[in-house]
């Protein structure tokens, strides 16, 4: 079997590529078509653990769920996780191979592309359709040489491309016309059509612009997708721009937006909860009174620990606990809660040690080998079942671990609870993705909006406006 391959590229970052691919994956899966997602190269700090013990971008894990599949490393063969302004950890087929700066990665691209093509070859043999997501924009002139994420990949495998633009941010016609103008003749020829995303208002008022666009570019407008309010899907990098503010909140959560924040998708289920008010606090902002301070993961924990101190979070946390508040650290956040954090090999930056915040009696040493596990177990606070995943390069030890937060099904324990029950920590990401009975131990009721409810919601409008002429490009005959 050899699959039909369609690639979705965007005029900009955050144009809606991930959501559109997830929506189409869901629709095709419901038609009984064997479909798989694919992203050749992803740059993201939010990642997920696969069934084969690797690491891929969260968007591809969500798209896999839309296809009725477990996440697999072939869905995202190259993942770049920035750990500074100029460098990133390079993950190939789910496992770290190097930490490189931009020049070093440019030299490594040929090797990375071989990994991309190997994953592509396996997927097209297993599935009827492979839906591919590009990265950023295909028109970044400085990144076009040896490109493996957008048109470089499309040219190599000879697939059709659909170009998506976000009308909500403005300039949609300039984005589309300009992007097409910056492509080579062969690249432009493989663009099958364009899609306008996040439209609000009367479609009739847009029609003259669509007619002009088709005349100007020679490309059909394949669809105009509506703006979907309250769509809580996993983000890859940016912290969500709009956190709900619920005047009737029964749980108030504050999250510091760390400079190197990683896997901030841990708060997504809280953002979707109608009675949880999540406040994302950046530099220069004063943390408001709350029930829970959540310290998220970090790709550079010692750097972000110093950032917390510089911005007065150590004093804010002490005041919060003094008045009976709760404090939870996840992964890097757990490490910050200990007494010391050691990085003798320079895994996350300059080698050295840093004092922790000191709220849990444990210390952590960073190690070269990354721990990647999907886990199931029970929360020892409230006796609720949990599932999630571990992604870290650390070994923690100390008296606090004698009172763990989780009992895992593989016999291990995880995390810690302080003697007074106010301070908690865990290495398991995704603890809020499943029924949140344990939050009831602190405040308020249990509720979540599961992804299997959200995915059909984004799939329906994506397909309802998708002309049937598009299906003839790539859907296999039965």
Swiss-Prot record:
Domain of life: Bacteria
Ranges for domain GATase cobBQ-type: 250-437
Pathway listed: Cofactor biosynthesis; adenosylcobalamin biosynthesis
Gene Ontology biological process terms in this record: cobalamin biosynthetic process
InterPro entries: Class_I_gatase-like, CobQ/CobB/MinD/ParA_Nub-bd_dom, CobQ_GATase1, CobQ_N, CobQ_synth, GATase_3, P-loop_NTPase
Keyword field: Cobalamin biosynthesis, Glutamine amidotransferase
Active site: 331, 429
GO terms of molecular function: ABC-type vitamin B12 transporter activity; catalytic activity
Function summary: Catalyzes amidations at positions B, D, E, and G on adenosylcobyrinic A,C-diamide. NH(2) groups are provided by glutamine, and one molecule of ATP is hydrogenolyzed for each amidation.
Protein family: Belongs to the CobB/CobQ family. CobQ subfamily.
Protein name as it appears in the record: Cobyric acid synthase
Taxon lineage: Bacteria, Pseudomonadati, Pseudomonadota, Gammaproteobacteria, Lysobacterales
């Amino acid at each position: 079997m050899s699959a039909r391959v369609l690639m979705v590229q965007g005029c900009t970052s955050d144009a809606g590529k991930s959501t559109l691919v997830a929506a189409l994956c869901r629709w095709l899966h419901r038609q009984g078509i064997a479909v798989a997602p694919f992203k050749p190269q992803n740059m993201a700090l939010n990642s997920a653990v696969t069934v084969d013990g690797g690491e891929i971008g969260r968007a591809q894990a969500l798209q896999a769920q839309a296809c009725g599949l477990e996440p697999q490393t072939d869905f995202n063969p190259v993942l770049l996780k920035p750990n500074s302004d100029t460098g990133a950890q390079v993950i190939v087929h789910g496992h770290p191979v190097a930490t490189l700066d931009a020049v070093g990665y440019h030299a490594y691209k040929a090797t990375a592309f071989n990994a991309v093509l190997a994953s592509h070859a396996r997927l097209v043999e297993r599935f009827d359709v492979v839906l591919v997501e590009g990265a950023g924009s295909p028109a970044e002139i400085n990144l076009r040489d040896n490109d493996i994420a957008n048109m470089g990949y499309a040219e190599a495998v000879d697939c059709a491309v659909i170009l998506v633009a976000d009308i909500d941010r403005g300039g949609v016609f300039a984005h589309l016309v300009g992007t097409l103008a910056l492509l080579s003749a062969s690249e432009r020829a493989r663009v099958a059509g364009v899609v306008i995303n996040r439209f609000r208002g009367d479609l009739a008022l847009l029609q003259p612009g669509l007619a002009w666009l088709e005349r100007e570019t020679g490309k059909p407008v394949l669809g105009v997708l509506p703006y979907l309010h309250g769509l809580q899907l996993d983000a890859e990098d940016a912290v969500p721009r709009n956190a709900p503010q619920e005047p009737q909140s029964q749980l108030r959560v504050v999250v510091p937006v760390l400079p190197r924040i990683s896997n901030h998708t841990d708060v997504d289920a809280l953002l979707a909860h109608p009675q949880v008010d999540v406040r994302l606090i950046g530099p220069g902002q004063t943390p408001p009174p709350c029930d829970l301070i959540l310290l998220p993961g970090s790709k550079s924990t010692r750097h972000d620990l110093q950032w917390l101190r510089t911005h007065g979070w150590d004093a804010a946390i002490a005041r919060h606990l003094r008045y009976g508040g709760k404090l939870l650290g996840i992964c890097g956040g757990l490490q910050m809660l200990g007494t010391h954090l050691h990085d003798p090999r320079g895994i996350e930056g300059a080698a050295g040690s840093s004092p922790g915040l000191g709220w849990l009696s444990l210390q952590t040493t960073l190690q070269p080998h990354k721990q990647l596990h999907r886990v199931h177990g029970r929360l020892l606070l409230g006796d609720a079942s949990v599932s999630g995943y571990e992604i870290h390069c650390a070994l923690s030890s100390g008296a606090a671990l004698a009172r763990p937060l989780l009992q895992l099904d593989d016999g291990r324990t995880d995390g810690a609870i302080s003697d007074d029950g106010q301070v908690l920590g865990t290495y398991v990401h995704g603890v809020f993705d499943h029924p949140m009975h344990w939050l009831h131990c602190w405040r308020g009721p249990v509720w979540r909006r599961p992804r299997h409810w959200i995915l059909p919601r984004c799939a329906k409008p994506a397909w309802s406006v998708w002309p049937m002429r598009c299906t003839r490009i790539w859907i296999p005959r039965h």
